[in-house]
Regions:
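ATP-dependent adenylation/nucleotidyltransferase module used to activate substrates
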Residues: 1-151, 162, 170-173, 178, ...
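AMP-forming adenylation/ATP pyrophosphatase catalytic core
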Residues: 7, 119-362
Length: 362
C-alpha cells in the first residue's frame, strides 16, 4: 500500500485492512524538506507526512517501510521539469513521477516484499471490457479523477493495481478519515507541484536556481511581430497565460507561442489560442487499442475531453519512440507543449503521451 501520509492513502489503507487484506505500507522518500520549512505541508516527503504514514500503519496494525528514492526522483522528474521550462514547455511532473518513479518502484518493491497487488490512494478505477481486458478508468468523482496522471500504466501493472477510493468522492473520504480518527484527517489538499510550491513565483525561483546559465531572455512580440517588451527567460511563460506578462497593450493579450530557440514570446488574442492538430511524442497505448480511431482527448488535468481522431505519425527520426497525430473535430484552446494528452473511451484510458507540438486550424 503506497502511503504518502495524506488522508487519501490513509483511508485506502484502512479499507483494505477492513477487508482482511494483508497490508504492507510503503512510503517513498523522494524529496528533502527541513523540519518546519514554510509551505512544506502538502508537498511530497514533508517530515510530518512521513510520520503520519507510519502512525496510520501503527494505528491499524500493519508493517510500514520507508524507502529512499531521492536520486531517481531528481533524475526522472525534477531535472526534466527544469529542462522543460527552460525549453519553453509546460511539463506535467505528476504524470512523469507516476510513470518513471512511483509505479516502477512500487512494483519492484512488491516483488521484494512478496505482495501480489499494489494499492494507492488515487481516485481512479480498474474496469474490464467485454473480452476481459483490464483498463485504467476515471474515478467516479470526476472533480478528483487522477486517471490522467496514470495513463502510462502497462497492462500487466493495471492487472495488479487496486484503487480503494475509485468509487468514492473526496468528501466521503474526508468524513471517513475523521470518523476513524486517522492521523492527518484534517490535512488540506496536496499540491500538484508537490516539490516546488503553489505560486508562479516559487516555480520560477526553483527553475532559476537550477538553470546553470541556461536562462533564455528575449523579446515579447505582439500578433503583428512587433516588439512590445522584453523578458528575462522563457521559463516565466506558458501558452494561454494572460497575467504577469510584463507588458500592457491596452487590450487582452495571451501567450500564443514560445520560441525557445530565439527566446521570443509571441502574444495574441483569445482566438489565436485555438489548436486543431497535436503531435504526441513518447506515446503509449493499451495493448488492445488499434489505430486509427476516434476517442475523447484531454490535454491538461482538470480540462474537459474533446473528440478527436488518433493515428500513427512516425517520422524519419522516430524509430526509437512512438509518435501519434491527434486531430480534433473542433479546435481546443491553450494547448501547451510539454503537457500530457490522454485518450479516453467511455471513461477508460486508452493511452496518451507528451504533447510535442500543437498546430492552429488551417
Amino acid at each position: 500500500m503506497a502511503m504518502s501520509g495524506g488522508v487519501d492513502s490513509a483511508v485506502a489503507a484502512a479499507r483494505l485492512f477492513d477487508e482482511g487484506r494483508e497490508v504492507v505500507g510503503v512510503t517513498l522518500h523522494l524529496w528533502d524538506y527541513a523540519e518546519g520549512t514554510p509551505g512544506s505541508h502538502g508537498r511530497c516527503c514533508a517530515p510530518e507526512d512521513q510520520y503520519d504514514a507510519r502512525r496510520t500503519a501503527d494505528l491499524l496494525g500493519f508493517p510500514h517501510y520507508t524507502f529512499d528514492r531521492r536520486e531517481l526522483f531528481r533524475k526522472a522528474v525534477v531535472d526534466p521539469f527544469v529542462d522543460a521550462y527552460l525549453a519553453g514547455e509546460t511539463p506535467s511532473p505528476c504524470a512523469s513521477c507516476n510513470r518513471a518513479v512511483k509505479l516502477s518502484v512500487l512494483f519492484e518493491l512488491a516483488s521484494v516484499l512478496g505482495a501480489r497487488k499494489v494499492a494507492t490512494g488515487h481516485y481512479a478505477r480498474v474496469v474490464r471490457d467485454e473480452f476481459g481486458h483490464a483498463y485504467l478508468a476515471q474515478g467516479r468523482d470526476r472533480r478528483k479523477d487522477q486517471s490522467y496522471f496514470l495513463y502510462a500504466a502497462r497492462g500487466d501493472e493495471i492487472e495488479r493495481l487496486v484503487f480503494p477510493l475509485g468509487d468514492s468522492s473526496k468528501s466521503e473520504v474526508r468524513a471517513e478519515a475523521l470518523s476513524r480518527r486517522l492521523p492527518g484527517a484534517n490535512k488540506g489538499e496536496s499540491q500538484e507541484l508537490c516539490f516546488v510550491g503553489a505560486t508562479s513565483a516559487e516555480y520560477v525561483s526553483f527553475v532559476e536556481s537550477r538553470a546553470n546559465g541556461r536562462l533564455r531572455p528575449g523579446p515579447i512580440l505582439d500578433a503583428g511581430g512587433h516588439t512590445v517588451g522584453t523578458h528575462s527567460g522563457v521559463h516565466r511563460f506558458t501558452v494561454g497565460q494572460r497575467k504577469g506578462l510584463g507588458v500592457a497593450l491596452g487590450r487582452p493579450a495571451f501567450v500564443n507561442r514560445i520560441d525557445a530557440a530565439s527566446g521570443a514570446v509571441h502574444l495574441g488574442d483569445a482566438d489565436a489560442l485555438a489548436r486543431k492538430r497535436l503531435r504526441i511524442e513518447d506515446a503509449s497505448l493499451r495493448e488492445h487499442v488499434t489505430l486509427p480511431r476516434r476517442a475523447r482527448v484531454r490535454v491538461r488535468h482538470g480540462h474537459d475531453e474533446a473528440w478527436a481522431s488518433i493515428e500513427e505519425d512516425r517520422g524519419p527520426n522516430d524509430a526509437a519512440r512512438r509518435t501519434l497525430a491527434v486531430t480534433f473535430e473542433e479546435p481546443v484552446r491553450a494547448v501547451s507543449p510539454g503537457q500530457v494528452a490522454v485518450f479516453y473511451d467511455e471513461g477508460r484510458v486508452l493511452g496518451g503521451g507528451r504533447i510535442g507540438s500543437a498546430e492552429p486550424p488551417s
